[in-house]
Amino acid sequence: MSDLVYQWLESANLQQYYPAFEQQGITPQRFITITIQDYGALGIQALPDKQKLFRLITTLKSRENILEQQPSAPNTGATPQSVPSSHVSPHVAQGDRFVGDKQKQNDIQQAQDMSLYESYDGGYEPPYVSAQGSGPANGDDYVIPTIPYHPNAPNPPNPRGIPTVNRTVVPPVDLFLNQIQSRIRVVIRKRPINPKELSQNQRDVVTADGWNQVSIHEPKVKVDLTKYTDLHTFKFDHVFNEQSDNQEIYQYAAKPLIRSVFEGKNCTVFAYGQTGSGKSFTMMHKDNGIYVLACFDILEYLRVYNGSQGNNSKFLVPVVSFFEIYGGKLFDLLNNRQRLQALEDGKGNVQITGLTEKQISSVDAMLNLIDSGLTLRAVGATGANADSSRSHAILQIALKYTKSGKEYSRISFIDLAGSERASDVQNSDRQTRMEGAEINKSLLALKECIRAMDKSNDSKSGAHIPFRGSKLTMVLRDSFIGNSQTVMIANISPNDKSCDNTLNTLRYADRVKELQHGKGGIIKFNVLKMGQNAADVILGTARDDENDVYKAGIVGVNAAPSQQARVPPASQAPITARQIQQNLPQPHYNPNYNPPNSKPAFEPRVETTDEDDMVRTHCDLVDSIYEQEDLIVRAHRRQVDSMMQLVKEEVALLHAIENDQVSIDDWLVKLSDILSRKEEAITTLKGNLSAFKQALQKEEELSHSIDLNKARKK
């Protein structure tokens, strides 16, 4: 089996490290469990070699029964160092970025005929420059894969390669190359159903229908207890099914942004979704999270970029910062969670005072920083998840000029706090409810900023971007203006118990992307949003927007095509979602046709105006409570400082009267003045506390009213 380890290393041109592996007693079983932190102990220090080993191990992990698939090496008595070159190397999965030489890569291409490669020849070339590739132009062993052909490429022996070549998730080449130029891209990731959900007899109700469409088969029960399935269909830029891994997500969603960063653009990748849907796994996984994979490529691109610059003053260095937004406040995760302040300078730029920024030179250095920061991140239990992230974690990698320190560009990786329905947090304590309201408000503000950014991209005069709507959008202001690109990864859970949250996630993502309809890019499939947008209820702060036109269309088999709702021309006055609901035509009933598992007829949704108003009021009240909290904390600090000053004056006055340095009359006057000022400071603080207690009591009563309203509907 030691020959097998040598063959694996040889396939990646890492055979020179085999003695260290042999000395450490690395078996094939241990080989595939090696982590990045172990590379140093094995003598692997060079960044290109670390990349090769990382991709080799990831490839081997992705192939099922890798050890059983390998033929037993003949026992000829030869040492691993003397293994002849004629030994067959392990089959290299599609998309591997390590090859031995030009002939070896050509052999791989002939054997699989499913992957396009472009060469890395030391020049600064983008990874997606052409849909036609013919292998490396020289013998360099580092190549950057592009996307495979579709739909003509044959199915690989293992659909879990890197990247996964699943015919249901691979977009057309020409369309994908056009997509990555868009300022906004929205992709969906479906996680696998887990054993706990299966043990609870939960069903998978999410299907990825092709590379850009997802369907939700929502189980429902009518008033007469008749069960039926309501079908919801959405289309996005890309849909990843449960077989997709982080490598594939990064390859298609985030990697194109790396090129944009080196073009001077500010880029943002954020993961959104219900708690437990895989956001942190996608963004912050310590071995193959998107930020880890991006750091590999950023450092490699940076080496190439700096090598192409003749002037040292144009050299760039990566600088990392990591902070969280919790309860509307900023905390530095690289400095023991110290409080930060987001302030605007005279030019209108947002500056985060006190933020720790550390220059990195390797992936290991960044991993150590992030691991220490993640231990400080705020988590808590909700009705949706027992270990929910209650803060937005923002990791920023800025490229700065070496000499001047001026920022050239920046890429932000955002692991958003979990989005829950109002009912998921209403039965929790006040702190959890307030956290949920603040989270939902910031998520709504983020959506509105992205949509406004899209409007400004189409408008000659530009549209106002409401980045002051929350602390999240305020600190990300540079990502919403100027030359910027954004990718949203919406994570969804497949089980039927999370169906409501899954639908709300998709509706949120659909609202982010809906303005792309009718433009020169993707033509979206119009999907009916039933009645008042349910996402508005969940977010708790959305209001009827008279300037929005909800693109409506009935998804079902009983409505005739001519009777589907139409969007009015742009010249007509815009209408609201409620008006569309009222103006929908009556469904066409066919008594002789009742397909199975489909909704027999369209049932109008019961209006929930009172509940909507209460949820909105609750969110506004929570926002006011957070503002009052900051004011009271500052008032308390002023009161303490004032008391300390008065105590000093009182002690000095006491010494004076004891030493006969002041007359009794003067002592009485000064002491009376000190006590009056003490009483005034205490009275003022107590008044602030009384108003704050009333706001908390009102929040408690409003939350209880929402619970009662939901209980009556059940």
UniProtKB/Swiss-Prot annotation:
Q: Which GO terms describe its molecular function?
A: ATP binding; microtubule binding; microtubule motor activity
Gene expressing this chain: kin-13
What does UniProt give as GO cellular component?
9+2 motile cilium; axoneme; ciliary basal body; kinetochore; median body; microtubule; spindle; ventral disc
CDD domains (UniProt xref): KISc_KIF2_like, SAM_KIF24-like
The record's annotation in InterPro entries points to: Kinesin-like_fam, Kinesin_motor_CS, Kinesin_motor_dom, Kinesin_motor_dom_sf, P-loop_NTPase, SAM, SAM/pointed_sf
Which residues participate in ATP binding?
G273, Q274, T275, G276, S277, G278, K279, S280
Q: Could you tell me what this protein does?
A: Involved in cell cycle. Involved in formation of flagella, regulation of flagellar length, and formation of median bodies during interphase. Regulates flagellar length in all eight distal flagellar tips by promoting disassembly of the microtubules. Disassembles microtubules at the distal flagellar tips in a length-dependent manner in order to maintain different equilibrium lengths of the four flagellar pairs. Regulates interphase and mitotic microtubule dynamics. Regulates microtubule disassembly dynamics of the dual mitotic spindles and the median body.
Q: What is this protein called?
A: Kinesin-like protein KIN-13
Instruction: Please list which residues make up the signal peptide.
Output: none
Identify the residues that the record assigns to the SAM domain, covering every copy: 1-63
Query: What is the organism field in this record?
Result: Giardia intestinalis (strain ATCC 50803 / WB clone C6)
Where does the Kinesin motor domain lie? 183-515
* Gene3D superfamilies assigned: Kinesin motor domain, Transcription Factor, Ets-1
